Amino acid sequence: MGTITLSRSGSKQTSLAANAPASAPPARHWPRDWPSQKQLLERQHGRLEVMLNTLIAEARALGPLANAAVTPSWELNCRRLQRALGLHLRLEERWLAQWGCLNSGHRASHRLARTAACQVEPGKDSRRPDPTPELEWLQGLQEWFFVHRDGADAIAYRRADHACRPGT
């Protein structure tokens, strides 16, 4: 097969050969050093916080007279939050354990959060479009998240900062 050459006036020529290897997307690798791991975990914290704030604001806006047509997307976003929180907690545990900075209390706190996150199934009772129980659930998760992030996580992250320094 032949080669097709494409060009625009003033731009670089591009060649499309039939036997040209397809370029694979770059492989994503998890960071191996603590500073990069910490940065990724902090970005996840930020996204989780935004998700919680958004869902709480939407639940307040929906109120007890929620329209059944509006709630499915909100319920889907609640499920996304549950999944994102679970994945974040597992990754954080793995990395903190790798640096010797995950204690049993921190792990137990994560277990409680996972249990609390799974206690509510948004939209399970479709006859009741009132998001008030979910609002209370979201506020409870938010409270845990803020306390945990500023408490157990902050302590464990400082320990990991110290543990990964050369000569310590």
Language-model-detected regions and their locations in the chain:
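Small-residue-biased structural context
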Residues: 2-168
